């Protein structure tokens, strides 16, 4: 993947790399950041001697998506103080060590990549006290509302199998 797009592994492309290992049966390849690939790709990677399928930032990317979705809800509920995205932008703009070498572009492109890039460089900022405080403030804003919404959803599902 790249900061702004995912390159799908082409299972139909000629396998020019795997024959190298025919003389080295105890060796294998490592595929880096495979978590953005479609599940159907993994057997093809294994057949091509990619025995180590490393995952990358997809889990933290999904977590950020969920937090920002909740942040949008908090905006509708009239949160006090800055949004989570604003707090994270302040943090990342003030300390660029985790993203500056990974992203290029205009000021606006960099701002978008800091928050939404597939490399998910924002993940290195979540442990910071300011980020933790912003997440806590978000949850405090939503306290009661999310529980209320979940209770309504559970009443709708009662008696139905969860699929």
Task: Please place each PLM-identified region on the residue numbering.
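Structured alpha-helical segments in the cores of large, soluble enzyme domains
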Residues: 7-23
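Flexible, acidic glycine-rich loops studded with aromatic residues
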Residues: 18-163
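Active-site-proximal beta-alpha loop/turn segments in soluble metabolic enzymes
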Residues: 1-6
């Amino acid at each position: 993947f790249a900061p702004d797009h995912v390159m799908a592994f082409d299972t139909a492309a000629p396998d020019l790399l795997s024959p190298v290992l025919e003389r080295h049966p105890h060796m294998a390849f490592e595929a880096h950041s495979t978590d953005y690939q479609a599940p159907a790709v993994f057997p093809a990677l294994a057949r091509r001697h990619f025995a180590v399928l490393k995952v990358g930032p997809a889990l933290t990317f999904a977590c950020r998506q969920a937090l920002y979705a909740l942040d949008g809800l908090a905006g509708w509920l009239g949160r006090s103080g800055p949004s989570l995205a604003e707090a994270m932008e302040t943090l990342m703009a003030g300390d660029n060590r985790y993203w500056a070498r990974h992203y290029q572009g205009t000021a606006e492109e960099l701002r978008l990549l800091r928050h939404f890039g597939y490399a998910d460089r924002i993940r290195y900022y979540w442990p910071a006290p300011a980020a933790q405080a912003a997440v806590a403030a978000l949850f405090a804003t939503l306290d009661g509302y999310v529980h209320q919404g979940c209770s309504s959803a559970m009443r709708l599902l009662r008696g139905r199998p969860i699929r």
